[in-house]
Amino acid sequence: MAMTPVVEPANAGIETLTSPQRFADAALIRRWHELLSASPNLDRTFQSPEWFEHARANPGARPLDAAVIVRRGRGGAVDAIVPLVKDYDALAFVAGPRTLHTFKLKSAMVLGSQFMGAEDEASYDELLGAVDQWASDCACITLPSVPDESFMRRWAETSRAVKQRFIMYAPFDPGTGKIFCTDFPATFDLYNSGLDKKRRDNFKRKVRVLDKQGKPGKLRRFESAGEVPEFLRVARGIAGKSWQSGIGVDPFPRDVDWQAKLSDQAERGLFRDYILECGGEPAAFGVGVVAEGIFHYRATGFDSSMSALSPGTVLTYLIFGDLLGGAQPLQKMSFGFGDTPYKRLFCNRDFAASRVMLLRKTPANELLWRSHAAFRTLVTRAKELYLRYRPSEDKAQKPAPAAGTPPESSE
């Protein structure tokens, strides 16, 4: 009697890893890094195994539930990886400087914002099914920073698998919209030669001004866990004298255990922070994360009393030199979300990007989505009407910078 052939299920090649022992498998880690090295994703730093371990450890708080979705091809080789953690996302109802209310949603966070694998709809639909199953207790799946022109964004908007189970929503978040970055050449000399003459001369002049003022600039790099306490002490001192402090913005919020957080990053080779000293005095700081050939500039600040010396510009310029001066020069630098003059000064590329939320199709989520979208439309329309009909004396006044945005005159 002939046996009936077994039909292989669609997700036969998919495996959801949830144990630390499986995460640490040497063969998986090697293949993980191979896939990362071929990825064009600017946020591949946050797809790395090192960042995944840092994210799930959640230093200073409770560890997060985590998983790695792995897909194997016909030959058994891993051809797609999706690292995930469960955390809380939020939809905030923001009008100008005021946050009226914030709804928190349990979410499966896709680290690096994109699936790491072949870019085709069937493949992504298959991976989504595995993510959906693991995140069945979550209200949504979050892609924190998706380029508008990426395959991931087009798939999220058009996939039938997404439309059947989720509401795709890209909420407007104040301070987002564009990401600025720099694609590095092989050396710092090549970077300088690629600048237009005006910018090149301007950078070098600002460095010389420090020498002429008797305050020569010195860049200090911090990489090890043992250096974290000193970095935090010096950086917090600078932050207290920064323009951000004047508007109530703290780059090191007290509800975060920065000692634990940065020390854990350092132990995983992710921590790369800087202090600029001018004549021996702390003048500016830069907070960064480095992995997979990319440096992410996550926060910066300078002592406002030294603004005439352009410490922020000098700091960033010297950081570029350091990133390109080592035995393994980095390939890219990301300044993240936000359109500010200093980013335009240093970056050679920008692109539109958004946070994308895949909200489960539930009555509560649909009500929240419709309410938030309608509120955002109302706020946008009100702003347009105000700008059109505001009194003439208001038009003559320059608007104050948004929180997190350095004044144009600061550098």
Task: Describe the residue ranges of each PLM region.
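A conserved beta-strand-loop-helix scaffold within acyl/acetyltransferase catalytic domains
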Residues: 14-100, 146-157, 170-308, 408-411
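Intrinsic-disorder-associated interaction segments
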Residues: 21, 25, 120, 196-199, ...
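Short, surface-exposed linear patches
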Residues: 41, 92-93, 102-106, 163-167, ...
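Noncatalytic linker/hinge segments flanking ATPase motor cores
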Residues: 60-61, 107-114, 123-125, 182-188, ...
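Acyl-donor binding region in acyl/amide transferases
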Residues: 88-170, 174, 292-350
